[in-house]
Amino acid sequence: MNTFKKKSLYAALAGVSALGVTGAAQAVSVNPDGLGQALIYPYYTVRDKVAGQPFTSLLSVVNSTTSAKAVKVRFLEGKNSREVLDFNLYLSRKDVWVAAIIPTATGAGIYTPDVSCTTPVVSADPTNPTLFVNYAYTGSAADNADTSLDRTREGYVEIIEMGNILAGTTTEDAVTHVAGVPPCDDFSSASADTVAGNGGLFGNMTLINVLAGEDYGVEAVALDGFSTQALWATPGSVEPTLARVNPRVSVVTTGNNTYVTDWSTTPDAVDAVSAVLMHNNVYNEFVLETVTKSGTDWVATMPTKRFYVPTGSGNNPGRLFQRNFNGNNGSCDDVVVTQFDREERSISVPGSFSPPPPVNVDAICWEANVITLNNTNVLGSRNLANIPTSFQSGWLGLAFSGSATAASGSVPAGKHVLVGGGSTVFNTGTGTTSALTATTFTGLPVIGFAAISLANGTIAGAGGSVLSNYGGAFLHKQTRSIQ
């Protein structure tokens, strides 16, 4: 974080007490330097790019601090963010943990060559991985969408710090490597030995397709200042989640203004996290050139959507999002798409998505969405919307309009907006501090990237022919609207 942003953060936090916000010496924010207490990996996949060419997703998490840590690792499928696996992970000081998400005959699983402690134990055998499960969307938990294990093949990942492990305790002894291997032998006092965390986690995900000759590496989004309390939960518990943010205060910088906003009295505990992820416009590039047989997919993941959207056929979830989750139709939110080529020409064609969403306007309907251009389907997703274009290269804009008081196009009043409590606003240009009695964030809480592939076929070399395919991942650029 640069010096100006640090100064604005400190000044704004210092003024929050004037709004009656208590315990606000810490507030959740997206750390642009990539370190935090909670990490969100926007996408994993083990789908086939084409038949017989599956992806593997390689995950890493690093503890950069001098304290051992307990963290919750959670995998969520991409349609409705139903949990498919979670476990507790223990990282010793300066530790790294890695794992691979791989395809199985019916779904997906995970294995790790790493010896850091997990409870329950995660398989180290790639031929017999720890399997993802469908318990959270079948039987009494069914959401009227696909109930098969195939649904586990794509989604996203959360890693949430439960806390630091006190030095000199039996738990720290159990997780500390001795000659490269921790004993992992005694977690009986893990809850008592865990205190509030201090962040310092970072991580990466690589989507690799060996047979296609492509990989896409993406950094995890880091939430800093997530909790001032220990968040210990037993293995198998659905806690902690992103709704455990504490205190319920967010810090967001846009332009010269830094907003420190109180969410302590709003209906949903996760609002502070949604606020730091809110964007009203998302931008990125695309390449579809014939010569290089290029393709482009965009990933747009909304990691807090599940906290707002109930299951059912109604179109009036409580706040922020437009529609309930309606089985295989998903939960659709309207979006305006504008296309630009590299020579300033633009196209904005309502209803351009294919297949048409069930709401008859351009919309994204899942929690981990993949938007492909000209059906190039770089990632092989099933949670897919297609944007046709006549441009071979350029950039796109996705706009999420909304208003707290009136309809905005096809978006009803009160949707695509999140209204919080008071804010302290610090302006780095003028050095002044002001206050808002209510604060409106417009847009949707979305993260993601563009995956661009290029295929040059095989090239003859001194050692024989080699495959010359390439892939790159590019984080989205965004704007914010806060009033």
Regions from the PLM with identified roles:
Residues 61-67, 77:
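Asparagine-centered strand-capping/turn motif at beta-strand->loop junctions
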Residues 89, 100-102, 107-483:
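Long, compositionally biased low-complexity segments
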Residues 28-62:
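A structural motif detector for short, solvent-exposed N-terminal "entry" segments of globular domains
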Residues 92-97:
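Solvent-exposed, conformationally flexible loop/turn segments
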Residues 74-89:
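Short beta-strand and strand-turn-strand segments in soluble, beta-rich domains
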Residues 56, 68-72, 395:
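Exposed beta-strand and adjacent loop surfaces of beta-rich binding modules
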